[in-house]
Amino acid sequence: MDTARVYLSLKPSKTAAGAQCVSPPSLPPDACRCPRSHRLALKLSCAGLILLVLALVGMSILVRVLVQKPSVEPCRVLIQENLSKTGSPAKLKCPKDWLSHRDKCFHVSQTSITWKESLADCGGKGATLLLVQDQEELRFLRNLTKRISSSFWIGLSYTLSDENWKWINGSTLNSDVLSITGDTEKDSCASVSQDKVLSESCDSDNIWVCQKELKCECMCNDS
């Protein structure tokens, strides 16, 4: 009886080998890359778009400021022309019972109250207690109140925390403008007499002077 011979092929078939070794097809190296010129154009477009947005934002802010800001400069020119022609600041318009001097309006009280009460009164008038600008303004107000024997309150008080005299707008007193006479204590406020600027108790009673800026519409509405 012949013995059957069985031969096993150890060589893998091409089909099997292909199934194991074949990898998915790859794309060409430059398939996902834009040409350099296209990328440069894209970057320039993005930069231009950003600049355009910033320009639009800036223009909108500028327009808003210009709309909200009153036209002050033409009014100042009219004020100066009025002063040069008439030589009288009284021609400048202020509210009724207020007096004008340079670019301010002043109101002198007829009664005497404490410093805090005078501060509140001026605030109720849409004004502030007097902020002395310079010696010339101080002389004007002293002449204005010469007939009144009482001193008058100004918007200046002593702050204990800073150990300094400060105006109600937060600025520190300049000794070249005013020199305070008297002791400075916890509750000290400044009043002006005919020859001195005094430190006295804020609870004392004095007349007071309110001030407000001369409004441009006072001049601009007249033509």
Curated annotation (Swiss-Prot):
The keyword Ribosomal protein does not apply. Residues 93-212 form the C-type lectin domain. Residues 1-43 are cytoplasmic. GO terms for molecular function: carbohydrate binding; signaling receptor activity. Disulfide bonds join 94-105, 122-210, 189-202. It is found in: Membrane. SMART domains: CLECT. One of its GO terms (cellular component) is cell surface. Keywords: Disulfide bond, Lectin, Membrane, Receptor, Signal-anchor, Transmembrane, Transmembrane helix. The chain crosses the membrane at residues 44-63. GO terms for biological process: regulation of natural killer cell mediated cytotoxicity. Plays a stimulatory role on natural killer (NK) cell cytotoxicity. Homodimer; disulfide-linked. Interacts with tyrosine kinase LCK. PANTHER family: KILLER CELL LECTIN-LIKE RECEPTOR SUBFAMILY B MEMBER 1 (PTHR46784:SF1). This is Killer cell lectin-like receptor subfamily B member 1A. The lineage of its organism: Eukaryota, Metazoa, Chordata, Craniata, Vertebrata. The gene is Klrb1a.
